[in-house]
Design a protein with these regions (language model features):
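Membrane-interface segments of envelope glycosyltransferases acting on lipid-linked substrates or membrane lipids
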Residues: 1-181
């Protein structure tokens, strides 16, 4: 299976690390994994499996990533798309729709959306909720890393419950702790 993972960059945040770990595991399981990063920067690049291709969209602003994402989705033809962190998630949904792709798309939310967080982002909860409601309806699943994150998104959106799934952040198991087969 061909999986496209869309992230803003590879800076040291927990969300980015989880997606690098997941991508590495998918690659080890025989899947073809490709990253599309708005900016190919950050220390986590060094943790990416050599089998994984990393595409640098070279976009300093998220909105400017729309056309490069459309082109890459068309060229790559992934079966699955995984995008993390709003507003990258919303732009990825738009790119998928405009590309004409039949890929299944999964959006991953790592942050609880409260007034103080929205203020830090420079947006109102209303505008965040509206953009999520209008775009996330087209996702196959909206994955939240905790019940708290899921509940915060449900408060600011009008999305059916069947769209939501909580999958807690995984942690990689060190090789010396894995059972021998």
């Amino acid at each position: 299976m061909k999986i496209l993972v869309v992230l803003p960059n590879f800076e040291g945040g927990g969300a980015e690390r989880i997606h690098v770990n997941l991508a590495n595991e998918w690659a080890k399981s025989g899947h073809e994994v490709i990253f599309c990063a708005l900016e190919k920067k950050g220390p986590l690049i060094n943790l990416i499996d050599q089998k994984i291709k990393v595409i640098d969209l070279d976009c300093k602003r998220i909105l400017f990533s729309l056309n490069p994402l459309i082109k890459n989705i068309r060229a790559i033809k992934p079966q699955k798309i995984v995008a993390a962190m709003w507003p990258v998630t919303t732009v990825t949904i738009l790119a998928k729709l405009l590309s004409g792709s039949q890929s299944k798309i999964f959006l991953v939310e790592h942050c609880a959306y409260e007034k103080i967080f929205a203020k830090l982002l420079g947006h109102s909860l209303f505008s965040i909720g509206l953009s999520k409601t209008l775009s996330y309806i087209f996702a196959n699943k909206l994955i939240s890393v905790s019940n708290g994150v899921e509940n915060s998104i449900k408060k600011i959106t009008i999305l059916p419950n069947k769209k939501f799934k909580v999958i807690y952040n995984g942690i990689p198991i060190p090789k010396n702790l894995k059972k021998n087969k």
